[in-house]
């Protein structure tokens, strides 16, 4: 159990059968009446955000999460197989469990997988990864002045918008949180 007074950004709690992460919190002490804690909670499973108010000192069940460092080894019949880097056990995850980050997975990539009561809650990819451009329109000389972008398909099949000067075969850095181009990789 954790007191609402001990809430911090990133704290995970169990509420109404779901696991929630505290995104924002504010301790309020009104001039009249008792103190309370106003929070913004994000569901770890669905991503929904709700605002909830707790009485000061209210006890809430804290969610115990386990974080494992796993390495993506191969894909078997649509499932992604990962190996635990410490125990060498294999774990198979579906693309639904991985989420939108599945399009960036390549063999040998290490990810953090968060478990709650033995169930996968979240797969955390590295914030930026380096991938090879396999398909894009050729750049035309003089196009760079406008600052435009064009679609490019990467080695994993993911599609991102890149500047016009990027060509096939180049290695680029991509932000996995918002699918944006970060720069060339030397």
UniProtKB/Swiss-Prot annotation:
Task: Quote the subcellular location field of this record.
Answer: Cytoplasm
Q: What pathway does the UniProt record associate with this protein?
A: Protein biosynthesis; polypeptide chain elongation
Q: Give this protein's Gene Ontology molecular function annotations.
A: translation elongation factor activity
Q: Which PROSITE patterns match?
A: EFP
Alphabetically list the UniProt keywords.
Cytoplasm, Elongation factor, Protein biosynthesis
Q: Name one Pfam family in it.
A: EFP
Protein's GO biological process: peptide biosynthetic process
Origin: domain of life: Bacteria
Family the entry assigns: Belongs to the elongation factor P family.
What function is annotated for this protein? Involved in peptide bond synthesis. Stimulates efficient translation and peptide-bond synthesis on native or reconstituted 70S ribosomes in vitro. Probably functions indirectly by altering the affinity of the ribosome for aminoacyl-tRNA, thus increasing their reactivity as acceptors for peptidyl transferase.
**What is the protein's given name?**
Elongation factor P
Question: What organism is this sequence from?
Answer: Prochlorococcus marinus (strain AS9601)
């Amino acid at each position: 159990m954790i007191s609402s007074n001990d809430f911090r950004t990133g704290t995970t709690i169990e509420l109404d059968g779901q696991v929630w992460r505290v995104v924002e919190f504010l301790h309020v002490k009104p001039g009249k009446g008792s103190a309370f804690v106003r929070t913004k909670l994000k569901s770890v499973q669905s991503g929904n955000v709700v605002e909830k108010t707790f009485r000061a000192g209210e006890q809430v069940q804290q969610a115990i999460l386990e974080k494992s460092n796993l390495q993506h080894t191969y894909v078997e019949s649509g499932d992604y197989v990962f190996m635990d880097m410490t125990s060498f056990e294999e774990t198979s995850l579906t693309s639904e469990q991985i989420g939108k980050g599945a399009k960036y997975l390549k063999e040998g990539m290490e990810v953090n997988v968060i478990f709650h009561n033995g169930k996968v809650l979240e797969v955390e990819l590295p914030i930026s990864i380096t991938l090879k451009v396999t398909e894009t329109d050729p750049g035309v000389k003089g196009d760079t002045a406008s600052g435009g972008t064009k679609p490019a398909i990467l080695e994993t099949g993911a599609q991102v918008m890149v500047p016009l000067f990027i060509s096939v075969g180049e290695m680029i850095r991509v932000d996995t949180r918002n699918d944006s181009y970060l720069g060339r990789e030397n």
